[in-house]
Amino acid sequence: MTQEEILAQFGPREAMEYDVVVIGGGPGGLATAIRIKQLAAEKGNDVSVVVLEKGSEPGAHILSGAVMDPKAITELIPNWKELGCPINQKVTSDDVLILSETGAQRTPDWLLPRNFHNDDCYVVSLSNVVKWMAAHAESIGVEIFPGFTAAEVLYDEHGAVKGVATGNLGIGKDGEPTENFQLGMELHAKYTIFAEGARGHLGKQVIAKYKLAEGRDPQSYAIGIKELWEVDPSKAKPGLVVHTSGWPMQDDAFGGGFLYHLEDNKVTLGFVLGLDYKNPWLSPFEEMQRWKTHPAIAAHLEGAKRIGYGARAINNGTPQALPKTVFPGGALIGCDAGYLNAARIKGSHAAIKSGMLAADAAYEAVSAGRANDELSAYPAAFEKSWLSKELNQYRNFKLWFKKGMLVGTVMTGIEQWLLPKLGIDTPPWTLHGDKPDHVNLEPAAQHAQINYPKPDGKLTFDRLSSVFISNTNHEENQPAHLTLKDASVPVNINLATYAGPESRYCPAGVYEYVKNDDNTDRLQINAQNCVHCKTCDIKDPTQNIVWVTPEGGGGPNYSGM
C-alpha cells in the first residue's frame, strides 16, 4: 500500500501541537531544546519543546571520536562538571604522526599547526555525553520521544514547514499493514529544527525544496569508522591523543587515523576517509583494518580486546558549502547544515553552539507571537559568533588536501602555523569545491584492483563480526529502508562500470552482489546490517540509492562510543 492509501484507510493521523519540534537527539538538537527551556524559565513563561530521536534511546546512534572542545557546553550549562556530565579526561599529550608503511615520524610540538593543539579539550564518549544531556533536558521540562523516526516533513497551505509526521509501525516487507500496525502521528510546531546529523534524510529534502544550497559549494563528506577497545592497564595512557596521516592512503585519497586514550583503560580509534576518492576498488573499512597493523598503532592494542564498532558519514566542514540555514517554519543546525570543523576534527562544539543560536531565534519568535516564518536572527547571530570566525579560519583545509598530500601539508602549515605567527588570523584567500563527492568516482578499468589482507580476528576483523558488536538490529519484517530509484542500475551501471563499489564503501556489509540461478548478477540489500552511516546515499555514483527512515528504534545501539 502507498502512504496515501494507508492514510485513506486508517487516517487521519493523531496530531500533537508544540511550539518547537526538534528532529534528532544529538548534541545539537538537545542543546536547542535545553536553551529554549532555559530562556523560558528565565523569563517566566512556558514554551513547549519536544525532541524526536530515532534511536532506541538518546545516545544509541551517537558516534564520534571524540576530542571535545568544552567551550559551547560551558556556555550552555556552565556548571556541567558539578552536575556530573561525563566529560572527565583532559587531553594530556598531542602526537601527530606521519606514517610510512612501517615507520612513523612525530611532528615536533613547536611545528604543530594550531588546529592540532587540543589544550583544554577532553577525550570523551559523545554517546555518554548525549545520554547525560538528554537526562538534563528532561529534568528542565523537555519532552523526548526515543524510538520515533521523523519520516515526513509537513507543510502548511503557504508552503511553510509546520512540523513532521513519524513513521508508521508494523508495515511488512510487502508494504502491507501487519497485525502490529500503528499509524504514525503528526507533530505540529511553530518552528521545526532539523538536527539529524550529516546528510539528514529530511534536511536533504528541505535543502532541495527551498533551494538552500543555491550559489554554495557542493557539500563534501568523509566516512569515519571507529572501534572501541579495552586495553591492559599497563598500556593505558589516559589523555593521549594521536592523529596520523600518510600510510595507508595514496596521494589521490584524503584520510587519516585517530587514536585516543580515555579513562578506565579504554582506547577509541578509527579512520576518516574523504568520500571524494576516485578508485572504486578502495574500501574504507579495509583501509581502517590495514591501518591498525602499523607498528605505531598496533603497539597500543597488544593484549587488548575490541568491544565496540560503528561508522558515520561526517561533513568536511567548509563555510563555502554551508547552505542557507533557515526557511519558512524551520532551521538546520549542526551537521545537518554542515558546521563540523574538519581541520580540528571536531563537530560537537559546533553542533551545540549552532543549536543555541537557533534556540535563541526560535524563542524570541515564539515569544513575539510569530509562527512558521524565517528565523533570520539565527544566521545573523551565527555570522557574529566565535563559531563563524573559527570555521572561516580553517575554510581551506580540506580543499588544499584535494590537491594532494604534499600541497595540503605545506598550505596547512602556511595557513595554520605561519600566518597566525605573523598576526594573520584568517587566510586572505578562499578556495572553492566544484563537484559533489560521487562525481569523482572513476571506472574500475582505470584503476588497479586492491587486494586487502584477510582479517586475523585479533587485531583486524571482517564486517559482519564488526556489525555484531555495534548491537545493530532492525525489525526484519519491514520494507527495506535502503531504496533504489531504478532497480536495474546496480547491475547495469554500478557493477558493469565501477565493479560494484557499494559492496566496498559500505562499512556494514549491506550491499552484496550475488548470482541468480541462471548465473546472472543481482544486488542483494541486507538492510538489517545498516548502521545508518549514510555513505551509500552520498557515494553512489548514479545517486540511485536513497536512504529513508526504517522503523523507530532500529539501527545501532552504541554504548560508550
Annotate each predicted stretch with a short phrase.
Residues Y18-V50:
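N-terminal Rossmann-like FAD-binding beta1-loop-alpha1 element of flavoenzymes
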Residues D46, K54-G103:
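N-terminal FAD cofactor-binding segment of flavoenzymes
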Residues A311-A342, S466-N477, P490-Y505, E512:
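FAD-binding beta-loop-beta segment adjacent to the flavin cofactor pocket
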